[in-house]
Amino acid sequence: MFMIYPLLIISNIINFSKSDKLIFAGIHFRHGARGPIKLGRNGQDLLGVNWTSTGELTPLGQKMHYLLGLRNRQRYIKEYKLLSEEFDPHELVVYSSDINRTLLSVTSHIQGLYPINPNKEDVLNPDKLDEAVPPINITFDDISEAINTLNISALPNSMTIIPVHFIDFSIDNSVECTEKIENLRNRNDRKKESIINFEKGFKANYSEVLKKFYQNKIEIDLNFTMITHICDATVADHIERRNMTEFFKETNINQEDFINTCYEALKINFRDKLFSDDNNELLLFHISYIIEKIVHYMKQRINDDIKEDISSTNFSDYSSPKMLILSGHDTTLTAQELFFIKFFNYELESYIFPTFASQTAFEIARKEVDDNSRKNLKYSDYTLCHYFNDKLVFNMTFDTFLEKIGKINLWNSDNINKFCYGEKPILTTNLIIIISMGVLALILIIIVIILIFKIKNQKDEYLISEHHPSTDDKCCSSEEDE
């Protein structure tokens, strides 16, 4: 059995009790199992295993998130009654990065959170079924059969569909920013002792056999970046139980040791390279927007909970979501957890590489109070618990959390522009439009002024010619008189 690194708990504070009222849950998870990021032209990864595409979610990855969705249904719908049994758009908001594997993961997750229910009552009016068709010709056999099968159901087996919004986890994908980030990360490679030592150890154990394996296949420079690519393929193959016999037979490498070494390589890569610059610029660049969004939804929910009239049936006044779901990557989960480790002063060794379908949660609860007392609640009456894969990372009152966050200079667009482009002013689309309109207006003003001067000059010349005839005119007239 291969070791999957467990989270080291960085707090042993007891969770809130089940008698408390859970009012909010913010979920941020990594996508499920995927194919390797690097594939050769022949469709093989760096271990010689065949794949059909790079980095796409696999059926195993879909199942991971379906089961995680079922687990979250048990906790947040059945156990804590945070969400309704059926999807309510006022209760849940879902975001994903604009990447296939995160979108498919969150779609699979939702099917577990709100499973297919053949016995669910639909809202279609039987008298209106003739109108429940698109305005084009659909009179062929397959569709006719589907119409009869659906009857008063909107979708087969009353499956639930939920809107998913895009969130730009990377914030800025410009060439200048990408180059700046890569240069900063490469400088970290050269100075981080953990990276240097790991690379030396890896080469000592595996360099010769790997070079022999790759001989006449690809040219390989066994630096730390290449090591992480090899390990990415190893982890993907291992999770999927792909046939790696050829690789381990040819190299004579101990499979269990190599897989554990690869998990360690990925951990060091994320912890000590991707977000480890001295000024935390890479960390703040990637995570500020996500932290602000999570905090925004938490504050909004608490504020509405304080003023909420539970007897009201008007959702327009109290429509802040009770749950936020973010479908992200190992980079986004790592950035989030390193943010708390560094700025909340926890031990760096508590970081753990987030494996496929890892989940973090922000849960807010309070003591049960009667309706009259609720309006007197304060942020200090709400407890925030943060978990990584069900292990408690920290808990504190919400006012303490906001105080800690308030001391951190989260980045805005100005910080990002300065980081990417230096002190040079950045011409955004709106600014370019404004400047262009200003230039056009100035040109029009100049043209109008020139026209006014021309008209005035022509008028003056006309008046002069009327009152003071030219000498030539006088001569001509005299000659004619003679």
Please tell me what each predicted stretch does:
Residues 1-9:
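Sec-dependent signal peptide recognition
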Residues 8-21:
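N-terminal signal peptide
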Residues 8-11, 228, 233, 456:
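Short linear motifs centered on Gly/Pro in flexible linkers and helix caps
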Residues 13-16, 431, 457-458, 475:
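N-terminal cationic leader/targeting segments used for protein routing and processing
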Residues 15, 34, 332, 433, ...:
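Intrinsic structural disorder/low-complexity segments
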Residues 20-93, 97-324, 328-451:
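Signature for phosphate-centric chemistry
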Residues 445-463:
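Transmembrane-helix exit/juxtamembrane "anchor" motif
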Residues 459-482:
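Cytosolic C-terminal tails of single-pass type I membrane
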